[in-house]
Design a protein with these regions (language model features):
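Intrinsically disordered, low-complexity terminal regions
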Residues: 1-310
Length: 310
């Protein structure tokens, strides 16, 4: 298996088709890559594994399948690298599961499944697929077709634009700019300004702690929760649905709480503005997977089976 001396973070580039990829970032001084056929009895799988190129130069690791694998996955790739390394992944009918702390992450996904633990920032173009990230310590810029996106927590501003699908964020600490032709937007907690527009889809802000929310859709419900005691300005309307506003006026708002503003418009849907308790919900890891989801990916390489650096 290729092993390279890497005393610090590196830049990893993965370009694969029909592959299962597992990346483990940890406190280590080398990078190890293991490539195996998913089915060792399959000539086509063996060929894909044999033709997979692994190169390292100038602090940059490149792993590339030169022969496309089958949609179910022909090759299993395990990469162990130093924590803080950046990752750029170009994927077609492939899945990637990354554990540990990565730096900046770039995703180009034609189709497939991505699970990331912690990244320092995200740039993504997704045609279709399912992406889940536990924590983004920085900004995120995401665009593409119809896909599912789940982010447990993000500290920087988020810009998301797509044609459809579903988007969920557990805790957004900064501003959100969300637009779609037909995506449901579901935000558990938002601490900054929000602009969300979708032609057809529901918009839910479980808890808006401060800032301005401008929420517009053609069809679908709009729901916003505002902390008890927080002063709020509410301007909402539905052309063909009902409006339930239990927040509009509060006799004695807490002056220490930030003021929020909500502007919401829908044609075919209900608008619900309500008070919510100042309680943080428990959030499980969004990157949890079924045991068989990545069963073909080889486990992380241990010191016992590493080859000598070359």
């Amino acid at each position: 298996m290729p092993t390279f001396a890497t005393p610090g973070p590196i830049a990893a580039i993965v370009e694969v088709a029909g592959s299962h990829v597992r990346v483990t970032a940890s406190d280590r001084t080398d990078t190890v890559v293991l490539v195996e056929p998913v089915d060792k009895a399959s000539r086509s799988d063996v060929k894909v594994a044999e033709k997979t190129r692994v190169d390292f130069a100038g602090g940059q690791l490149s792993v590339k399948t030169t022969v496309p694998g089958r949609k179910g996955g022909s090759v299993a790739i395990a990469i162990d690298l130093p924590a803080g390394s950046s990752l750029a992944a170009y994927l077609a009918h492939s899945d990637v599961h990354a554990d540990g702390l990565l730096g900046e992450c770039e995703l180009h996904l034609a189709s497939g499944l991505v699970r990331l633990d912690r990244v320092g920032g995200l740039t993504a173009n997704i045609a279709s697929g399912d992406v889940a990230i536990d924590h983004i310590d920085g900004r995120a810029a995401i665009d593409g077709g119809a896909f599912a996106m789940r982010i447990g927590e993000v500290t920087g501003a988020v810009r998301l634009s797509n044609s459809g699908g579903r988007a969920w964020i557990g805790h957004a600490s900064a501003d959100l700019d969300l637009s779609s032709g037909g995506c449901d937007f579901d935000i558990d907690r938002a601490d900054g300004d929000i602009a969300a527009t979708t032609a057809s889809g529901a918009i839910r802000i479980g808890r808006l702690t401060r800032g301005q929310a401008t929420l517009v859709n053609g069809s679908g419900d709009i729901e916003v929760g505002i902390d008890e005691g927080t002063a709020a300005r509410v301007d909402v309307d539905s052309e063909r649905g009902s409006v339930r506003d239990s927040v509009a006026q509060q006799a004695n708002p807490d002056p220490s709480h930030a003021k929020v503003s909500v502007h919401a418009r829908t044609r075919y849907g209900d608008v619900i503005i309500r008070r919510t308790a100042n309680v943080e919900p428990h959030r499980a890891s969004v990157t949890s997977t079924n045991s068989d989801e990545l069963a073909c990916v080889p486990s992380r390489v241990t010191s016992a089976n590493r080859a000598s650096p070359r």
